[in-house]
Amino acid sequence: GAGESAGNVKKYEGSAELATQLEAAGDAVAEYLNEALKTWEPPKFLWRTLYTLLLLGLVVKRVVWQRKLNMQQTLQQIARVGPDTLGVAMLTSSFVGMVFTIQFCKEFSKVGLTRVIGGLLGLAFTRELTPVICAIVLAGRVGSAIAAELGTMQVSEQVDQLRTLGSDPVDYLVAPRVVACAVSLPILSLVSFSIGMAASILLADLRYGISPNAIIDSAAKYLESGDIGIMSFKALAFGAVIATISCGWGQTTTGGAKGVGESTTASVVISLVAIFVVDFFISLTWFQR
């Protein structure tokens, strides 16, 4: 009995010692985490993304719900977006269309299916190529300029001066640019689609001897009004996303001239990624109905 009691006492003492050690370890971990949280800052990308989402919500609130928009600034931005983007978008669409024409004509001529080339070109242009190409051009030409402009205003405290004068930066700087890009990109896409199809028709006729009427008839047979609609909707969404990201990254710029350059580059990269992500979800929703 005495041996058993001694064993139980030793077990109890061992358990108490283990509990004390675990408690001390827990206190040390808690203290470490507490100190780490005091000095932890969220990643710059995270809070920039949250700020950009907030900007998008504010723009929707101002424009859609409150019907509040600075028309003078918006028209100025539309006049800026068109010339900056149209020429490059048309040229890019032309060559992309001709590249696809070469592939389609070469492969489908082997199996006697030249009658479907026009339809395939039309579907490829309306559903994917035209809105994505124009969005990429917009991100590189206009989005970068917006980020650089607003970034410069931010680091030079011009945005703070606007607030001091009683002007809301969202109403004066952000909303006009978002609306301008969202309105302009569908128009640019329609023009680029026409130019791309024209270049494809010309190449098919001159290089492969396929009649322009055959291409046009095939495109008219396969294309529906919904295809033009999805092209316009994608372009509108891409324009709004690009402008919002560019404004968000511009208005969160820090670090002087170096920060402006970094924000400009980052805004273009994030915009390009966002284009393809948004494109995927729109296509998944639209074409799975």
Task: Name what the model sees in each region.
Residues 117-160, 245:
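Hydrophobic alpha-helical transmembrane segments of multi-pass membrane transport proteins
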Residues 150-175, 257-260:
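Short cytoplasmic-facing helical segments at TM-TM junctions of multi-pass membrane proteins
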Residues 260, 266-283:
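Final/C-terminal transmembrane alpha-helix of multipass membrane proteins
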